[in-house]
Curated annotation (Swiss-Prot):
One of its GO terms (molecular function) is fructose 1,6-bisphosphate 1-phosphatase activity. The gene is fbp. Its EC number is 3.1.3.11. Mg(2+) 1 binds at E70, D89, L91. PANTHER family: FRUCTOSE-1,6-BISPHOSPHATASE-RELATED, SEDOHEPTULOSE-1,7-BISPHOSPHATASE, CHLOROPLASTIC. Pfam families: FBPase (PF00316), FBPase_C (PF18913). It is an enzyme of class 3 (hydrolase). Keywords: Carbohydrate metabolism, Cytoplasm, Hydrolase, Magnesium, Metal-binding. Its cofactor is Mg(2+). This is Fructose-1,6-bisphosphatase class 1. One of its GO terms (cellular component) is cytosol. Substrate binds at D92, G93, S94, S95, Y195, K226. It comes from Campylobacter fetus subsp. fetus (strain 82-40).
């Protein structure tokens, strides 16, 4: 089985997953379970259902060695001779489903070992008025589900040198002085606030609108950030950097310089056009 075929099989599997999760979102129970995930968040029934859909679909893909889910404490080994590890957030923004906001699924495809340098592809699906998917091996590519049930290529995606949108997470009272000053500067420059609380939706908007900044900084109540490196942060860092943008944790030059020590590790994170990231680092390093 050739390398290209293996990756195509993974992508096609994610297409099937996206359609199934999209259908579940229309009709499924929005209630909570009696369980918490690895980071202590109470699991929605939709989180568990989405996780189960992903697991069942990937069990049939022999090139996948193991699955690493935000909803599971440990990796699930499925094919001992597989070469890829799929790390994923089955339903990012699931707490917003009850208000009918767009939510999504995030996938990072790692080769042989779960470390930043081994990430070879990133894919996310966004469940909104339309079902869309962004696939990135080299250049991010946008696909949309068509009437005939297939995903049609729409366009390559790229970021401008400077954007206009600002999506900033975290409770403001917990921000550092440097972050507060930086965000004020962006608004003084005319940036528009665009923040829904779903990472996929906010980063998708910035990517499709050509640029801006998404940030989830360290706060007093979450000094190591809240977003998870393997499932959320690195896949989007992979996409943004290949779209011509930049990423940082506020210290390193790139989010790919993070020392990954555990599956559910979190980090402060910033994604955007090069202008915004460079300006942020000026404030953070002052």
């Amino acid at each position: 089985m050739q390398k290209g075929y293996k990756m195509q099989e993974i992508i096609k599997t994610i297409e099937k997953i996206a359609v199934k999760i999209s259908e579940e979102l229309k009709y499924a129970d929005l209630g909570y379970t009696d369980h918490a995930n690895s980071t202590g968040d109470t699991q929605l029934k939709l989180d568990v259902k989405s996780d189960n859909i992903i697991t069942q679909e990937f069990i049939g893909v022999s090139s996948v060695r193991s699955l690493v889910s935000e909803e599971k404490e440990d990796a699930l080994d499925i094919h001992k001779d597989g070469e890829f590890i799929i790390a994923y957030d089955p339903l990012d923004g699931s707490s917003l489903v009850d208000v009918n906001f767009a939510v999504g699924s995030i996938f990072g495809v790692y080769k042989n070992e779960l470390k930043p340098s081994n990430l070879v592809a990133a894919i996310y699906c966004i469940y909104g008025p339309r079902l869309e998917m962004v696939v990135c091996e080299d250049t991010p590519k946008l696909y949309r589900l068509d009437r005939d049930g297939s995903f049609k290529f729409i366009k390559d995606l790229s970021l401008k040198e400077k954007g206009k949108l600002n999506a900033t997470g975290g409770t403001q009272k917990g921000w550092s002085g440097a972050h507060r000053d930086f965000i004020k500067t962006l608004f003084d420059e005319g940036y528009r606030l665009r923040y829904s609380g779903a990472m996929v939706s906010d980063l998708h908007q910035i990517l499709l609108k050509g640029g801006g900044l998404f940030s989830y900084p360290a706060t007093t109540d979450a000094p190591n950030g809240k977003l998870r490196v393997t499932f959320e942060v690195l896949p989007f860092a992979f996409i943004y950097e290949r779209a011509g943008g930049a990423t940082t944790n506020g210290e390193n030059k790139s989010l790919f310089e993070i020392n990954l020590e555990k599956i559910h590790q979190t980090t402060p994170c910033f994604f955007g056009s090069k202008y915004e990231i460079n300006r942020l680092l000026e404030f953070y390093n002052d």
